[in-house]
Amino acid sequence: MKQNKRKHLQTLFETLGEKHQFNGTVLAAEGGDILYHHSFGYAEMTEKRPLKTNSLFELASLSKPFTALGIILLEEKGILGYEDKVDRWLPGFPYQGVTIRHLLNHTSGLPDYMGWFFANWDSHKIAVNQDIVDMLMNEGLSGYFEPNEGWMYSNTGYVLLAVIIEKASGMSYADFIKTSIFLPAGMNETRVYNRRLSPERIDHYAYGYVYDVHSETYVLPDELEETNYVVYLDGIQGDGTVNSVTSDLFRFDQALYQDDFISKASKESAFSPVRLNNGETIDYGFGWVLQNSPEKGRIVSHSGGWPGYSTMMIRYIDHRKTLIYLSNKEEDTEYEQAILKAAEHILFGQPYDVPERPADKKKKAIDTAIYSRYVGSYLLQDGTAAQVTTENERLYLEIAGQLRLELFPSSETRFFLRALSVEVEFTLGEDAAKSFILYEDGSEEEAVRTK
């Protein structure tokens, strides 16, 4: 049976690899045995340096399970508690009632640091965790909701968890995670790595690449205006910046089954859903997305996405099956989900299809003079403000609290966004656009011009 699954996994990924439709490393395992482990494509495109199974990837938000586990281990030692208020560890913290549990569960309601940094940060400086703390302490930003009144994925919360780990342990976040998690699990290649803040030459490093619509080539995100925030946000830890290899992640997966690595009680807490004040449950634990499937049992997983990197670890814990997917070339999200779904079907002996990669998006040549008719202020149906601007014969959309993104023409009135399943279509009046429709993941929302 395992041999048959191995053969199908090989067929799936070699088909994709031969057509240059997958650039990354994948590992599939069952019952503690690795069924398939292979790399395709390049670790460094300009040098044509191939990826290998020991290539080191930025995990992005797949770092969050490690940050959460750091907190869990400190709780097991009695050094901190899940119900500790954040102001116990950060005196003067202005968001009252927020606990460590809220940070772990994404129920704190804290403001998102990325939107503020996009708008206010000096991009010539690399931010570190203390800059996030200073923002929260000094900027008077409103939270989204009172603690545990709602659920919103929060990078801010996981940065604060890293800060709390440092204060509670007396060690740097990187050193604590290394000595408490990486080394005990045998993850000798894994590290917290801020590549631009503290660069090292790592021969087996997998550089991440993003698609440049203008040149129709893949480039480092540092070189592209709308992704170069990877430079000035590079010093932030806790929500990302763990770097690892597939074999180490498999060792981590196996260690999580051992009660001497993390206790049964702690695993029960980590893999339990959030319960909000109104009684609603959310399928997120302590750094893990939770699912229950009639066929596949309990599933705990986490993904990561950062310019140039897409990562996923899926643990089918009732069946001791594991999928680990690390990619360093930007791809359509739905396409990557189709790859993972095919691999999952193989692991469970189900029929599967080899997905077809969508073509890279190409812009249409139009007269950019028409852009002036689209420039203005708009209001989305949910009350969010949006600005359409033009600069150097390029058109941009900026939704309040988000990064300014370039709009690429597919016609004179319809535009697409790079690397997102989002399109914008303007409705023209006599002299200027009256509104636009925002199409995203099968839904649509109108934005009406206000100025």
Curated annotation (Swiss-Prot):
Keyword check for Acyltransferase = no
- Does Cell wall biogenesis/degradation appear among the keywords? yes
- Disulfide bridge partners, by residue number: none
Task: Name a Pfam family for this protein.
Answer: Beta-lactamase
An example GO biological process term is: regulation of cell shape
Show the InterPro entries listed in the entry: Bact_CellWall_Synth/Modif, Beta-lactam-related, Beta-lactam/transpept-like, Peptidase_S12_Pab87-rel_C
Which residues does the Swiss-Prot or TrEMBL record annotate as the active site? 61
What are the coiled-coil residue ranges?
A: none
User: Which GO cellular component terms, listed alphabetically, does the Swiss-Prot or TrEMBL entry include?
Assistant: membrane
Q: In which pathway does it act?
A: Cell wall biogenesis; peptidoglycan biosynthesis
The subcellular location is: Forespore outer membrane
Report a single Gene Ontology molecular function: hydrolase activity
What PANTHER family does the record tag this protein with? D-ALANYL-D-ALANINE-CARBOXYPEPTIDASE/ENDOPEPTIDASE AMPH, PENICILLIN-BINDING PROTEIN 4
Q: What does this protein do?
A: Probably involved in peptidoglycan modification during cortex synthesis.
Q: Which family does it belong to?
A: Belongs to the beta-lactamase family.
- Put simply, this protein is called Penicillin-binding protein 4*
According to its UniProt entry, this protein's organism is Bacillus subtilis (strain 168)
